[in-house]
């Protein structure tokens, strides 16, 4: 695999699809006028071949080639399991 692919740590918010999941990660953006840092959430669709992740898990994902119209990230592994 290419060494300059992006990897992220995200929280799983939905896994109701087959071989897919929706994850969300937060980033902080500085307001252009007031200078306050604002929390922004980004949702991504990921490819989970074996349906390993569950809602609430912290997972590692990697950018890849486009798999479908909305999926361009793939599941790497579970970092922390959900408490349920």
Swiss-Prot record:
Any matching Pfam family: Ribosomal_S17
GO BP annotations, alphabetical order: translation
Keyword vocabulary terms for this entry: Ribonucleoprotein, Ribosomal protein, RNA-binding, rRNA-binding
GO-annotated cellular components: cytosolic small ribosomal subunit
One MF annotation (Gene Ontology) recorded for this entry: structural constituent of ribosome
Keyword set includes Metal-binding: no
Top-level taxon of origin: Bacteria
Leader sequence residues: none
SUPFAM superfamilies attached to this UniProt entry: Nucleic acid-binding proteins (SSF50249)
Function of the molecule: One of the primary rRNA binding proteins, it binds specifically to the 5'-end of 16S ribosomal RNA.
Quaternary organization: Part of the 30S ribosomal subunit.
Stated family: Belongs to the universal ribosomal protein uS17 family.
Xref: HAMAP family: Ribosomal_uS17_B (MF_01345_B)
Protein name per Swiss-Prot or TrEMBL: Small ribosomal subunit protein uS17
């Amino acid at each position: 695999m290419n060494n300059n692919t992006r990897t992220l740590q995200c929280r799983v918010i939905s896994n109701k699809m087959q071989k897919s999941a929706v994850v969300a990660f937060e980033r902080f953006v500085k307001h252009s006028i007031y200078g306050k840092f604002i929390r922004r959430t980004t949702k991504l669709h990921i490819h989970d071949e074996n349906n390993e992740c569950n809602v609430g898990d912290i997972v590692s994902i990697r950018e890849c080639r486009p798999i479908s119209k909305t999926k361009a990230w793939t599941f790497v592994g579970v970092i922390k399991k959900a408490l349920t």
